[in-house]
Amino acid sequence: LWGSAVLFLLNLIVVNFFNAWLSIFVSFLVILWLYAKEAMKEEDRHTTFKNFYFYLIAGGLGLSLLFMFVRTPLFPSIQFSAEVSPSLLATVNIGFKTLSQNTANLFVGSGPGTFAYDYSLFKDPAINQTVVWGVRFGQGYSFISTVLSTLGFLGILSLLALVGISLITIFRNVARHESKHTLVSGLVAGCAFLLLGWFIYPENFTLSLLAFIVLGILMSILHRDDAPVWGIRDHSLSFRTPWMMFGFSLVTVFLIALSVAGIYVEAKRYIAASRFQNAVTVLQQTGNVDNAIQGIGSSASLDPVNDQYQRFLAQAYLLKTQSIISASLQKVPSPEIQADFRNAVNSAVGAMQAAIQLNKIESFNWRTAGSIYETLIPLVPGADQSAINAYTEASSLDPSNPTSYVDLGRTHMIISDTAQGLLNQRNATAEQVKQYSAIRTSS
């Protein structure tokens, strides 16, 4: 145990993360309060043992306070990836702008896991002057501040009520009763550490799971009557009637079936993610578009509600379309090449439309649609306006991203060049000349 503690301390010193030191400082404050409360109630015995723990707590407080203000890397040779997130003020501003969109957002927010879309819609344009201008953050400064956008006032009030009631219950029970057991002190300090993390660090599965587990164990221990911490209490549950036995069996079978179904669905999602990653790797390393299409298509079939797979599938078909166009420039297109071109275009458009149907507020889906139609401008009538509409929709969903406006400007240039090329052709019809003259003027 002591070896694990020393190793943990060394890791903290090497990483030197401010939020971790702050959480540890608060945890040691809680332990110091528990120690002082018990020391004032008991007679002065085991002085040496108690002094050792007092000095240990004081050392932990001093060390964590020291490293909270030491921001210089202690080991410059060890490189860590930068951990970047929006500031607290920026996250709160995005939250209030999201709530002001409509009445539903005011009470329940934009929905779980949608902060990335809120960030794209309401981020400060000044972020474009920084190196992270192209990064779309999936979470804000912390879990609690992110909830303001995703779950609204009802969500954040519920979480704050959970934290407040839990802390009041814990400290009221600890203050009224003796907490001689080391387990109770450790759980109280750990609970303070994890709940504070909700306010100063983005949410992740591990921290959330640990927070609820520690909170549940601590509540269970504190609400026991006079049983010792590691005591065993007998509880019995009996079903004396056939109907109760039948109902219990039915619930058990339902839960087992639900568990099996959940495992099956998660296994499919895992396989889909694995095949998708392999397909992208193959495309990057070998440039084999057909194999990539097969792999991404398999992922889209296994996880049909994931718009990312459909978007990447559309992009893969777009690469195939572009390769067919490049090959047709070298010679007169044969009927086979024309058929391949039509199939690739139809597949790209179909996958792109599927991605948009799955997630209409994803700007990347609309940008993919714009890039497909942009490629088809010289070849397919009406593709020009479709490209403009798609890029315009993308810019409305991510108004502070300059890339969408660059895409839109490039599209107008292609339209203008296409119109000029058609005007230069001797066999251009009067209707085509009139149509593309108007397009060129507007572009």
Report residues per predicted region.
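Transmembrane alpha-helices of multi-pass inner-membrane enzymes
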Residues: 1, 22-35, 159-163, 169, ...
